[in-house]
């Protein structure tokens, strides 16, 4: 095999795409900062018990594992940064009030999580800790929408759900983990036949409720249908009222509901949201509430947030037009260097043509040139 061939679903990022990614990264972090979120940078690898605490089987299978040559302990390359940020909040910051944190960095997956996806996403996310009310859920949705607007994503729609509905149905019956996984998979896939088989050993009331949940997706009328179909489910009124309140603050946006949407990581414990875009084949943002995510670190705190893959956004958003550069001759004189430095300080891109390469095509598009006229350096338009 050729030495330059990369593993499947791993790719180099070339200059034009790298510029686009970096512009989005800066813009997303600045947008989060505008809401008061502080940037943190967790490490690329951690001990497995820290990375995978409370995350479920799906994330375990997505995590690359190896042995630390220093300690002999098992460590993993992160597949998701949510647990890492929860650890930072719980032990390193240890604040008592509301804490807002954001992050951006590469994660690694053993398998792509969607068709044609990279196994090295560039994950951006934001988390708010310390507030259990609907306001934190809503802020997460609004920040995610503002991030997509900044990126130029069009045709956005929001899908709302809540992990407590199905969890409340299954908790009293103590179903085994294999059955629970089958039920969750059937609900996520909207597979009525598989759901019927997976829930065959459950009480009849639970089976009826699960079958009802499978059909509870669509516009706001779904909430009224859920009140009737799930009237015997404890806490369902609170769940539905919370979803209705979040949707009310998203007036003017396309909002739908899907009480069987259980896709994504298993640590969600309350309201969830998924954001879709016109040109994307899969969700561009997943988020919600995960109050139990810090329990493994000895400090359970209310938490809500979201994450997205910047590389996925690059595939659906056209890059901004690159400002044309100034072409300059190579001039080893102090006055030329000073003038070029002034131009660069003013935000201009100045590309110096190295000796012997004057006739070669430049990597940057140039529409002006630096010339020396009557002993003075000046910028003039390139003749075409």
From Swiss-Prot:
GO BP, sorted A to Z: histidyl-tRNA aminoacylation; L-histidine biosynthetic process
Gene Ontology MF: a single term: histidine-tRNA ligase activity
Superkingdom, natural source: Bacteria
Pathway: Amino-acid biosynthesis; L-histidine biosynthesis; L-histidine from 5-phospho-alpha-D-ribose 1-diphosphate: step 1/9
Annotated keywords: Amino-acid biosynthesis, Cytoplasm, Histidine biosynthesis
Predominant location: cytoplasm
Other facts noted in the record for this chain: This function is generally fulfilled by the C-terminal part of HisG, which is missing in some bacteria such as this one.
Assembly notes: Heteromultimer composed of HisG and HisZ subunits.
Function in brief: Required for the first step of histidine biosynthesis. May allow the feedback regulation of ATP phosphoribosyltransferase activity by histidine.
Family: Belongs to the class-II aminoacyl-tRNA synthetase family. HisZ subfamily.
The protein's name in its UniProt record: ATP phosphoribosyltransferase regulatory subunit
Species this chain originates from: Paracidovorax citrulli (strain AAC00-1)
């Amino acid at each position: 095999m050729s030495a330059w061939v990369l593993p499947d679903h791993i790719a180099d990022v070339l200059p034009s795409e790298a510029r686009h990614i970096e512009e989005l990264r800066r813009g997303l972090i600045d947008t989060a900062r505008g809401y008061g979120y502080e940037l943190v940078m967790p490490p690329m690898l951690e001990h497995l018990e820290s990375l995978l605490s409370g995350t479920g089987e799906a994330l375990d299978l997505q995590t690359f594992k190896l042995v630390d040559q220093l300690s002999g302990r098992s460590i993993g390359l992160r597949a998701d940064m949510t647990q890492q940020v929860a650890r930072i909040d719980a032990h390193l910051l240890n604040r008592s009030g509301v804490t807002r944190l954001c992050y951006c960095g590469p994660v690694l997956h053993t398998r792509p999580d969607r068709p044609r996806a990279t196994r090295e996403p560039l994950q951006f996310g934001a988390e708010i800790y310390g507030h259990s009310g609907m306001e934190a859920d809503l802020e997460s949705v609004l920040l995610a929408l503002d991030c997509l607007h900044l990126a130029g994503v069009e045709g956005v729609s929001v899908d709302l759900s809540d992990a407590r509905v199905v969890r409340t149905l299954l908790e009293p019956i103590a179903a085994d983990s294999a059955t629970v996984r089958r039920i969750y998979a059937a609900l996520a896939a909207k597979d009525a036949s598989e759901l019927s088989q997976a829930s065959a050993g459950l009480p009849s009331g639970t089976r009826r409720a699960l079958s009802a949940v499978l059909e509870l997706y669509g516009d706001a009328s779904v909430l009224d249908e859920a009140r009737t179909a799930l009237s015997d489910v404890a806490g369902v009124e609170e769940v539905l009222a919370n979803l209705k309140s979040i949707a009310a603050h998203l007036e003017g946006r396309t909002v739908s509901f899907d009480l069987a949407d259980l896709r994504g990581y298993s640590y969600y414990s309350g309201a969830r949201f998924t954001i879709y875009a016109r040109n994307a084949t899969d969700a561009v943002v997943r988020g919600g509430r995960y109050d139990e995510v810090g329990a493994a670190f000895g400090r359970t705190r209310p938490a809500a947030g979201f994450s997205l893959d910047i590389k996925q956004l690059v595939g659906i958003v056209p890059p901004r037009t690159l400002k044309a550069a100034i072409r300059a001759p190579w001039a080893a004189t102090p006055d030329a260097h000073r003038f070029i430095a002034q131009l660069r300080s003013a935000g201009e891109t100045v590309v110096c043509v190295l000796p012997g390469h004057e006739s070669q095509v430049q990597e940057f598009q140039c529409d002006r040139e630096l010339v020396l006229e009557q002993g003075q350096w000046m910028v003039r338009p390139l003749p075409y």
